[in-house]
Amino acid sequence: MTQLEMARQGIVSDKMKQAAADAGIDAEILRQRIAEGTAIVCHNNMHANGRPLAVGKGLPTRVNANIGTSKDDTSIDNELEKARVAVAAGADAIMDLSTGGPIDEIRRAIIAETQACIGSVPLYQAACDTVVKKGKAIVDMTADEIFDGIKKHLDDGVDFITVHCGVTLSTVERMDNEGRIMDVVSRGGSFTVAWMTHNNAENPLYEQYDRLLELVKPYDATLSLGDGFRPGCLADATDRAQIHELIILGELTQRAWDAGIQVMIEGPGHVPLNQIEANIQLQKSLCHGAPFYVLGPLVTDIAPGYDHITCAIGGAVAAGAGADFLCYVTPSEHLCLPNVQDVHDGVMATRIAAHAADIVKGLPGAMEKDIAMSKARKGLDWETQYCLAIDPELARKRRGESGVDEEHGACTMCGEFCAYKVMDERKPKQ
């Protein structure tokens, strides 16, 4: 039985117990939410060293880090270091999006490197193999090659796979009729639309969705239903193509649940601040409360080099409104492949957004951390502040580099004129 099937039969599995303990939630409550589809336990039966990850309603907002090679940078060592840095920085999951070099070897090395939840987009490799190994165009892929690629990733232990099943001929027609500035910016979505247009055929992952469900079920992996029509700029947000795809994903969610397979839904993208909450409400309604996994959202299009900040702003609003899983964006977004420092900075920025949202959600223990930090600050207790900081190493480093005079105990911003010290001096001396 799958985790969903066990949950529906009232069985609390070992994976549920482990994931619940890691999340700080009662295992029976987690089971109930898995049964209703509002939470998942993400773990492939083939991922021997992986820890099950609980995502969804009433759980900590999760953070994913995307890594992976490109044709221009195929170093396995670089990607393994990014994986290590992402986990050390607090990422809950890692997606390998490699499109260059020995892709199988890279994915297997990343899976072996960490216990973190691992995701991938099998279509990327299917497309790359078609071009590099077979000398054909992406549009010449066969449906069997797409499904064979999915099976290979599942065999390797990938815990969740992004599949662009909601990219359909009817959605393409709506996009073309309404018009967009940036058309399709999802890489997997663009591959699929190009294939459909060239072959004048429906998306195999939609047309043969039952085949996909049968393939995934023995692994008990999670389907991450990709948003091929996510907006790539603010002006394209919340248009007909995006929402039509979301309606389809809601239908596919129910079909997956009927087959005993866990699902989460992927979301935008680039979205103006005043539209983010509405996007979350639409997803939760149309997709029946399934966990929502959003990329950002980025709240402006003009900040290349700072898109980890635009992502964190949107991510905090989205998660505060009910999004469950935030995919980070790094400072290199829209510019180049991220380096190791970019990965660290992206994870930290998105963790800040996730924590801010957990306070809004009333997650047990979230606000308590901030209260403890406030008390340590008032008492000029620097060691406790370092321990409570989201990035202890950076906090210690910046203070240490400042040349602070430890005799007054404050920092170089105020020194002896520190407000805490001034207020402390007005207290009666014992």
From Swiss-Prot:
Known cofactor(s): [4Fe-4S] cluster
PANTHER family xrefs: PHOSPHOMETHYLPYRIMIDINE SYNTHASE, CHLOROPLASTIC (PTHR30557:SF1), THIAMINE BIOSYNTHESIS PROTEIN THIC (PTHR30557)
Task performed by this protein: Catalyzes the synthesis of the hydroxymethylpyrimidine phosphate (HMP-P) moiety of thiamine from aminoimidazole ribotide (AIR) in a radical S-adenosyl-L-methionine (SAM)-dependent reaction.
Summary of subunit composition and partner proteins: Homodimer.
Pfam families: ThiC_Rad_SAM
Pathway info: Cofactor biosynthesis; thiamine diphosphate biosynthesis
Keyword check for Lyase: yes
Residues engaged in binding [4Fe-4S] cluster: 411, 414, 418
Family recorded in the similarity comment: Belongs to the ThiC family.
Protein name in the entry: Phosphomethylpyrimidine synthase 2
GO BP terms, alphabetized: thiamine biosynthetic process; thiamine diphosphate biosynthetic process
Keywords per UniProt: 4Fe-4S, Iron, Iron-sulfur, Lyase, Metal-binding, S-adenosyl-L-methionine, Thiamine biosynthesis, Zinc
GO CC aspect terms: cytosol
Residue positions binding substrate: 66, 95, 124, 164, 186-188, 227-230, 266, 293
Catalytic activity: 5-amino-1-(5-phospho-beta-D-ribosyl)imidazole + S-adenosyl-L-methionine = 4-amino-2-methyl-5-(phosphooxymethyl)pyrimidine + CO + 5'-deoxyadenosine + formate + L-methionine + 3 H(+)
Residues bound to Zn(2+): 270, 334
Top-tier EC class: lyase
Gene: thiC2
Cofactor remark: Binds 1 [4Fe-4S] cluster per subunit. The cluster is coordinated with 3 cysteines and an exchangeable S-adenosyl-L-methionine.
Entries under NCBIfam families matching the protein: PRK13352.1, thiC
Gene Ontology molecular function, alphabetical: 4 iron, 4 sulfur cluster binding; carbon-carbon lyase activity; zinc ion binding
InterPro entries: ThiC, ThiC/Bza_core_dom, ThiC/BzaA/B
EC number: 4.1.99.17
SUPFAM superfamilies reported for this sequence: Aldolase (SSF51569)
